[in-house]
Design a protein with these regions (language model features):
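Cytosolic/nucleoplasmic/matrix-facing N-terminal domains/tails
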Residues: 1-167
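C-terminal single-pass membrane-anchor helix
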Residues: 169-203
């Protein structure tokens, strides 16, 4: 099974991928192999997590293992459509025979090879609400390419979740913990001030 997980920087895609994969792998008794998750502390997680070196050799990992690659476009990025897909891409065509479950994390699905987008079993997108602790989590069986357009998710399953602070220290976010602190947009604050002033002047 291939899952693509997307979201803008600071929208919790890596944090929530770690949380969700860890809980599922632990419940199923599966081992997780990860690449490019900076400063990950496996001892703080429930499942067994191991670092591996070459994402292009993902298919050589033990059968039935779970695989997570952050900033996956570095190894599974787009290519000239006239070129033949390399082995580490075509191997996804028959991955069900080995029981691998792969999670590719990137900011935008269009950063990934079109071959993978067509083979994807599930697309999870995270959308942070007003830079707060609240997120919208969208899930679709097919890849939704225009992730910058909110209406693109009208047919996706939607769930509201919150950033879990317990996972802030599990890995080193390139954004830093301060990036996850709530911050209301300036336009929203100004609008509230105008409304408050109007109410005050009406008395």
């Amino acid at each position: 099974m291939l899952y693509i997980r997307t979201g803008k920087p600071g929208h919790g895609k890596t944090l929530n991928t770690i949380k969700e994969v860890d809980q599922k792998a632990h419940a199923e008794g599966r081992t997780v192999y990860f690449h490019n998750i900076n400063g990950l502390q496996p001892e703080q997680l429930k499942a067994s997590w191991y670092k591996f070196d070459d994402p292009e050799k993902w298919f050589e990992l033990p059968n039935d293992s779970v695989i997570v690659v952050d900033e996956a476009q570095g190894w599974f990025g787009g290519r000239d459509p006239r070129a033949r897909p390399p082995e580490h891409i075509t191997r996804f065509e028959t991955m069900r025979h080995s029981g691998h479950e792969v999670h590719l994390i990137t900011q935008d699905p269009r950063y990934l090879d079109v071959h993978l987008r067509r083979l994807c079993n599930g697309h999870v997108h995270y959308w942070r609400v007003f830079k707060s602790q609240q997120l919208l989590r969208f899930v679709s069986e097919a890849v939704i390419e225009k992730v910058e357009v909110k209406s693109s998710f009208k047919d996706a399953d939607k769930k509201t979740i919150r950033l879990d602070k317990k996972y802030f220290g599990v890995y080193t976010s390139t954004q830093g913990q301060h990036h996850f602190q709530a911050k209301m947009p300036t336009k929203f604050i100004m609008a509230m001030l105008v409304i408050s002033a109007a109410v005050y002047m009406s008395y």
